[in-house]
Amino acid sequence: IKMIATKTNYAHYLYDERVGIKEKEYRCNVPWGGIILETKDNYLVLGEMDKKTSVPHCLQIPGGGIDEKDICNGIVKVSQTIKRELEEEIHLNLDDINYEIKYIEIPDEERHTYGFIAIGNLEITKEELQKHFEEYKKSLIKNNLEIEFNKLVFLEKSNAIEELNMLKNPKRPYLSNLIKKIVIGDEKND
């Protein structure tokens, strides 16, 4: 996929994210990369955004916008974005995860983003990941560093759609359809 990107500022992004820009030529069509993780005991992993982030308490997958560090010789390395965000938000190394970019989010009237979404399979359980995350969060607090995910949310894959719908948190617009595609896709493969 080829696209031409122009640098903007955070205020432009936040305004479009929170209020929305109707005029097509002024929209902030942000490219981003993310990964939905599945533990070895069949839980899908989401994060609840911290209260100090752009969308407080919102549920999303680990991921975020393209950063200058993700661009090499004018080429955006989406896997580098995913790697960086996964490290920042959960403190996992993408190099240790079997993953594949499988889904693309295209901008529409409501959400002005290009999302490149990977699925990653972890070799640890829900409990092991939870313990890892809690230790990481303590380290961030101790060192007065930014917390992006306040907590992890685990959805049992076989019941993920229902569990997601029961949660009262705001959710990124792509999340419900992504979970459905993953669950239904696996049902088709059974």
How would you label these PLM feature ranges?
Residues I1-I61, G65-R84, H91-D190:
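N-terminal leader/linker segments that precede catalytic domains of diphosphate-processing enzymes
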